[in-house]
Amino acid sequence: MAAILKSHIKTNSIRIGFVPLVDCAPLILAKEEGFFEAEGLNVDLVREPGWATIRDKIVYGELEAAHALAGLCFGISLGLNVLARHCLTGFLFNANGAAITISNELIKLGVTDNQSLRNFIFSNKNKRQVTFGIPNIVSSHHFLLRQWIQPAGINPEEDVNIIVVPPQLMVSCLESGLIDGYCVGEPFNSLAVSKGAGSVVKESADLSPMHPEKALIVTKDFSDSRREEHLAIIYALIKAAKICDTEDGRSRLSTILSKPQYLGVDEVIIRKSLFTGSDGMKCDDFNVFSRFGVNAPSNSRANKVISQIRNAGLVKNLKDISINSVFREDIYLEALELSKKKQSENESSEILSMI
């Protein structure tokens, strides 16, 4: 099998959107290594400034698929701040990969964790409210920020101001004093540290280990009408994600992702989130692309996202949506089976060539 049902796949271009973050790595690698092309797919990668653009372009058919927030599948399907359309995912890009960064001004004022932040907020009542940036209301970053501040007795609705800021603008907003901190994915935590604008106070792998982060989202219409292509995309991403979790793969990714058409950030900064240690993020599993079965959109991962959406008060009634219709592990498993079959065929070919 030279490719997954290659002769039957349509030749229509497939536009896949992405936001320039380190966790889009499997998508970029699949394109750069020719994995999509090998499966007969004509994929165009479209760089977008933020999640609102990704959301709208998926809803209105300007993108066929996207690297997106895991929570956005439910957000679009529920019609949160957008026209409701049934979206789904058959592949999760990664787990973990985010952090909370605060301004060095707050650090100088003695804020180093959530408890010292609380002390500062309640001694600062007559001054301006502390403002945090998040990429989207249904992003893991919103939920992680709430999870960090609430145990310290900080009310996210009353004691701080939480606003939506596109990921690429987080650092400049921190530098200018428009926000006092943020929760976001890489490279925008490491970039703030390198610029002397802020310090990382919490990594998401510490706060909520193995939380689902990004997903490949498509509409149900796309998945139904172009199923073979959808499976082939996921197959290529599974293959790429495995490479992203190897040391050699991460070294290559640092260079590839730094290209201007992708992240456009110095590869030294990108390496800080791909290789943990004294010069980068501290958690060993800061970014997980394939290990521990993180690519499967399982019921347990779906329930985690839904629970976070509910706990944040974003929806009251979830009766109109089934988690099994949004997080489609069955589609992932079908693509995974094709991946295993392809690997077995390749191994058989290698053995025959040696005879």
Residue ranges and their predicted role:
Residues 2-157, 180-187, 197-204, 209-210, ...:
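Short, glycine-/small- and polar/acidic-enriched structural segments
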Residues 100-101, 215-218, 222-223:
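Short glycine- and hydrophobic/aromatic-rich loop-to-beta-strand nucleating segment
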Residues 155-160, 224-229:
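Inter-helical turn/loop segments and adjacent helix faces that build the functional surface
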Residues 163-168, 186:
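Active-site glycine-rich loop that binds ribose-phosphate moieties when present
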Residues 210-213, 252:
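Short gly/pro-enriched beta-turn/loop segments at secondary-structure junctions
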Residues 227-326:
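Secondary-structure end/capping motifs
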Residues 306-355:
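Conserved C-terminal helix/tail region of periplasmic/extracytoplasmic solute-binding proteins
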